[in-house]
C-alpha cells in the first residue's frame, strides 16, 4: 500500500505545469512523460525527440497553440484553444511535428 501512495504522489508531481509556460506539450496522455514548455509567441519548426510523439497539451488563457502535422509548419493543422487536453482529438495523437504558441 505504501508503494502505491508514493507512485501516485510522483505521478501528480510529474504532471505539474511549468510555471509561466503558456503552452506545454507532453509525450504521453494525461500530461505524463517528457514535456516541453513553449514561451509566448514562440514557434518550434522541429520538435526533436518529441516529433510525432506528443499525446497531451496544455494551453494558457489568452493563448492558442497551432499544431502542424509536418516539420517547418507544413501539412495539415489544428488549433488548440486555452485549456488542458489530457488526450488529443482523433488523428492528432503522436502526429504533431511543429507548432506555434500565440498569445495576446
What are these regions (language model features)?
Residues 2-7, 11-104:
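Compact beta-sheet-dominated domain cores in extracellular/mature segments
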Amino acid at each position: 500500500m505504501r508503494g502505491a501512495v508514493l507512485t501516485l504522489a510522483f505521478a501528480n508531481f510529474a504532471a505539474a505545469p511549468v510555471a509561466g509556460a503558456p503552452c506545454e506539450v507532453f509525450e504521453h496522455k494525461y500530461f505524463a512523460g517528457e514535456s516541453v514548455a513553449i514561451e509566448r509567441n514562440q514557434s518550434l519548426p522541429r520538435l526533436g525527440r518529441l516529433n510525432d510523439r506528443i499525446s497531451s497539451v496544455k494551453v494558457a488563457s489568452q493563448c492558442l497553440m497551432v499544431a502542424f502535422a509536418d516539420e517547418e509548419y507544413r501539412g495539415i493543422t489544428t488549433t488548440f484553444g486555452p485549456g488542458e487536453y489530457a488526450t488529443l482529438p482523433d488523428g492528432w495523437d503522436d502526429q504533431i511535428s511543429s507548432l506555434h504558441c500565440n498569445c495576446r
